[in-house]
């Protein structure tokens, strides 16, 4: 295995193990991390995080998906430490509920008026979209 990955949330350590690759939803777009990646600290956006191989899955080529609700990532010496506001595995998300929540959040965003309502609707939309994306990766819906 190439990377030691630790994902921590305020409630508990979420996941700790080895993997071959991780794709993070950073503030500037998706960032892939492989063995011997340059050291970096980056902000994480609300979005889908993917982990390939190792203890994350039964197969070297299998991807596992997680919804991350923002945070930070530190990459250094083949260790990836993620401090996330919240994290949830695709396996723990109901696909139908995720789809319904996404469609509702999208509709609410489109009809939002006023700055506060738009900001709240945008965050709810990003959150619902992340959950729906990771379920689609896992369930292929």
Swiss-Prot record:
<dbReference type="Pfam" id="PF02823">
    <property type="entry name" value="ATP-synt_DE_N"/>
</dbReference>
<keyword id="KW-0139">CF(1)</keyword>
<comment type="function">
    <text>F(1)F(0) ATP synthase produces ATP from ADP in the presence of a proton or sodium gradient. F-type ATPases consist of two structural domains, F(1) containing the extramembraneous catalytic core and F(0) containing the membrane proton channel, linked together by a central stalk and a peripheral stalk. During catalysis, ATP synthesis in the catalytic domain of F(1) is coupled via a rotary mechanism of the central stalk subunits to proton translocation.</text>
</comment>
<dbReference type="InterPro" id="IPR001469">
    <property type="entry name" value="ATP_synth_F1_dsu/esu"/>
</dbReference>
<comment type="subunit">
    <text>F-type ATPases have 2 components, F(1) - the catalytic core - and F(0) - the membrane proton channel. F(1) has five subunits: alpha(3), beta(3), gamma(1), delta(1), epsilon(1). F(0) has four main subunits: a(1), b(1), b'(1) and c(10-14). The alpha and beta chains form an alternating ring which encloses part of the gamma chain. F(1) is attached to F(0) by a central stalk formed by the gamma and epsilon chains, while a peripheral stalk is formed by the delta, b and b' chains.</text>
</comment>
<dbReference type="Pfam" id="PF00401">
    <property type="entry name" value="ATP-synt_DE"/>
</dbReference>
<dbReference type="GO" id="GO:0045259">
    <property type="term" value="C:proton-transporting ATP synthase complex"/>
</dbReference>
<dbReference type="GO" id="GO:0015986">
    <property type="term" value="P:proton motive force-driven ATP synthesis"/>
</dbReference>
<dbReference type="InterPro" id="IPR020547">
    <property type="entry name" value="ATP_synth_F1_esu_C"/>
</dbReference>
<dbReference type="InterPro" id="IPR020546">
    <property type="entry name" value="ATP_synth_F1_dsu/esu_N"/>
</dbReference>
<keyword id="KW-0813">Transport</keyword>
<dbReference type="GO" id="GO:0009535">
    <property type="term" value="C:chloroplast thylakoid membrane"/>
</dbReference>
<dbReference type="GO" id="GO:0005524">
    <property type="term" value="F:ATP binding"/>
</dbReference>
<keyword id="KW-0406">Ion transport</keyword>
<keyword id="KW-0375">Hydrogen ion transport</keyword>
<keyword id="KW-0066">ATP synthesis</keyword>
<keyword id="KW-0472">Membrane</keyword>
<protein>
    <recommendedName>
        <fullName>ATP synthase epsilon chain, chloroplastic</fullName>
    </recommendedName>
</protein>
<comment type="similarity">
    <text>Belongs to the ATPase epsilon chain family.</text>
</comment>
<dbReference type="InterPro" id="IPR036771">
    <property type="entry name" value="ATPsynth_dsu/esu_N"/>
</dbReference>
<keyword id="KW-0934">Plastid</keyword>
<keyword id="KW-0150">Chloroplast</keyword>
<dbReference type="GO" id="GO:0046933">
    <property type="term" value="F:proton-transporting ATP synthase activity, rotational mechanism"/>
</dbReference>
<keyword id="KW-0793">Thylakoid</keyword>
